[in-house]
Amino acid sequence: MAREGKRIRAAREGIDPTKVYSLTDAVKMIKDRSKAKFDETFEISMNLGVDPRHADQMVRGVCNLPNGSGRTVRVAVFARGAKADEARAAGADIVGAEDLLETIQGGTIDFDRCIATPDMMPLVGRLGKVLGPRGLMPNPKVGTVTMDVKGAVGAAKGGAVEFRVEKAGIVHAGIGKVSFDDQKIVENARAFADAVARAKPTGAKGTYIQRIAVSSTMGPGIKVDPASVLAAQSA
C-alpha cells in the first residue's frame, strides 16, 4: 500500500487540482505519468446539469469511437435461423436463443455486449433483472435491438461505447488506452463528448455540460476545459 501511495503521489506532481487544462495538455500529462505495469484505460467523466430521477432528463446513447476502445469486446446475440448465421459470420462470440437464456439464468454471463433481433425480445425480457443492472439489456435506443445484426456486432467489436447518466448526473466511459497516440485519444474524447451533447434531453435546464475530467485507470483525474473537448457544440 505504501508503494501504491507513493506512486499516486508521484502521478499528482505537477497537476494543479484548481486548474482547468486543455484536452491536449491533459492527455499528455496523463500519458507522461502513467507508470502502471499494464496498458491503462483512458477514461472520461462528464458532470451534466440533469436530474435523471426525472424521465425527461435521462441521458442515454451510444458513441462509435473513431479509433476504437482498445479492448476486446465479447458479444452475445439472441437470434434464430439466418440472423443467427449472420451474427456468427459477423464475429459474435455467443449466439443462441433458449439455450443462451438458460446459460445466463444459470449464472454464466461471459460477454460485454448483448444484441437481439426484435422477435427475440419476449424471450430476452425474462432476463431484465439479470442483464438490466449490468447494463447489458438490449435496447433499440442504442442499436442493440435490431435486424441489422451484422452492423450491430461490427459496431460493438469496433469500439461502440454505450453511456447512461448516473444518479449524480455523471456520465463516464473508457475511451481508449494510454498506449494510443495522443491524437487518437483526443479524437475519441471529442467524439464521446459530442455524442453526449447530442443526447441532451428536453428537460435539461441551464448549463448542460458543466464539468469534464479525464484520467487513466490508476491515475488522478485532471479537470478539462469543456470548450477544448466540444468541437462543434456549446458547453
Curated annotation (Swiss-Prot):
Gene name, Swiss-Prot/TrEMBL: rplA
Protein role: Binds directly to 23S rRNA. The L1 stalk is quite mobile in the ribosome, and is involved in E site tRNA release. Protein L1 is also a translational repressor protein, it controls the translation of the L11 operon by binding to its mRNA.
Family: Belongs to the universal ribosomal protein uL1 family.
Subunit structure: Part of the 50S ribosomal subunit.
KW Nucleotide-binding (keyword) present: no
A GO MF label: rRNA binding
Full protein name: Large ribosomal subunit protein uL1
SUPFAM superfamilies to which the protein is assigned, alphabetical: Ribosomal protein L1 (SSF56808)
